[in-house]
Amino acid sequence: MQNMVILGATGSIGASTLSVISANPFAYSVYGLVANASVDKMLALCVAHKPKVAHMVDEAAAKQLRAVLPATLNIQVTTGMNDLLGLVTAAEVDTVMAAIVGAAGLVPTLEAVKAGKRVLLANKEALVMSGELFIEATKRSGAVLLPVDSEHNAIFQCLPQEVQANLGRCDLAASGISHILLTGSGGPFLRSDLATLAAMTPAQACKHPNWSMGPKISVDSATMMNKGLEFIEARWLFNTQAEQLKVVIHPQSVIHSMVQYRDGSVIAQMGNPDMRTPIAHCMAYPQRIHSGVEPLDFFKVGQLSFYEPDFERFPCLALAMDACAQGQEATTVLNAANEIAVEAFLQGQIGFTQIAKVNEACLVTVPKCPMGSIEDILALDAQTRVYARETLASIA
């Protein structure tokens, strides 16, 4: 029986994880649930899954949860960073699902790694912001790191065992690998006239054609910043050089990514677009369990198509690839700027195409200095957010 903590329990990844746990009740136990401020959702999860600990990042939300949670459930409600770090490093915890969206997930995810936990990584920002530190911490602690993002999980499944066992430190060329092909659907605006993009609304941006996701990642998919962040994450997970990574637009989201080998072979991972598949794979690896996902019906798939990315349509993707080439400081700046810009777009403060303008302004302007610690990373993140908000004020 694996005891699990779910960071981001009330989000879409959290819901999918709990669905897989419910399908395999004799193999997994919910030890802790972590959310920001959604009291009603957390209350329902506590009643359904009966964790030992329910942690609310928001202190007022924790107080509200304590007031409404039935005492008979005997669930400890905690708040504050110290309690959160204590939860993810607790001796009773085997596995941590790292699914808090954005930079907020970095510190608890890194602490789980340092504690040697089995970490299921759905928070791509952890590697985008702290790739080298994160990989080094994994190496020192012996933590097991497994990628949950559908694309990185697909790549992982297509790799030989010696690469799977050495994430972040592997040698792709030595294993006969020539390229990693990172697929992306192109989002809801793949076929939209370029002249119409500036007027696109948050509701339109969040209407992904294939995947059901939260608002932030949905907007990132519409700008293809999500693919850019995944490009950076893949660089650290698979120890790649830029020339070993290619982005491929694949609108049907049936092939989740591919690995191309020196001999001309290409291995692809396919399946219906449902996050329960990569989640179940990571939870059970190297075994396989029931995920609740319907198997792919090849007779209904129809045509599969592939295109090169259009960087005029997706400037955020180009910015992310450029930042990856510049290094860790640039990717940290880009991530922070994008979080502020997307939040502003969702609140109606800026237009869709202005997201890229905010990101580019921060990349060009925010001074970058060497980062040797988590404190350095968080300081640069905070500095960038200040500048991004100033940039918003000038264009809003």
UniProtKB/Swiss-Prot annotation:
Binding site for NADPH: 10-13, 123, 125, 214
EC number(s) on file: 1.1.1.267
Reactions it catalyzes: 2-C-methyl-D-erythritol 4-phosphate + NADP(+) = 1-deoxy-D-xylulose 5-phosphate + NADPH + H(+)
Origin: domain of life: Bacteria
Pathway of action: Isoprenoid biosynthesis; isopentenyl diphosphate biosynthesis via DXP pathway; isopentenyl diphosphate from 1-deoxy-D-xylulose 5-phosphate: step 1/6
Gene3D superfamilies: 1.10.1740.10, NAD(P)-binding Rossmann-like Domain
Disulfide linkage: none
Residues reported to bind Mn(2+): 149, 151, 230
GO molecular function terms attached to this record: 1-deoxy-D-xylulose-5-phosphate reductoisomerase activity; manganese ion binding; NADPH binding
Positions bound to 1-deoxy-D-xylulose 5-phosphate: 124, 150-151, 185, 208, 221, 226-227, 230
Pfam family for this entry, one: DXP_redisom_C
EC class (word): oxidoreductase
GO biological process terms held by the UniProt record: isopentenyl diphosphate biosynthetic process, methylerythritol 4-phosphate pathway involved in terpenoid biosynthetic process
Role description: Catalyzes the NADPH-dependent rearrangement and reduction of 1-deoxy-D-xylulose-5-phosphate (DXP) to 2-C-methyl-D-erythritol 4-phosphate (MEP).
HAMAP family for the chain: DXP_reductoisom
Similarity field: Belongs to the DXR family.
Record-given protein name: 1-deoxy-D-xylulose 5-phosphate reductoisomerase
Species, as recorded: Shewanella baltica (strain OS155 / ATCC BAA-1091)
Lineage, top ranks: Bacteria, Pseudomonadati, Pseudomonadota, Gammaproteobacteria, Alteromonadales
Gene name per UniProt: dxr
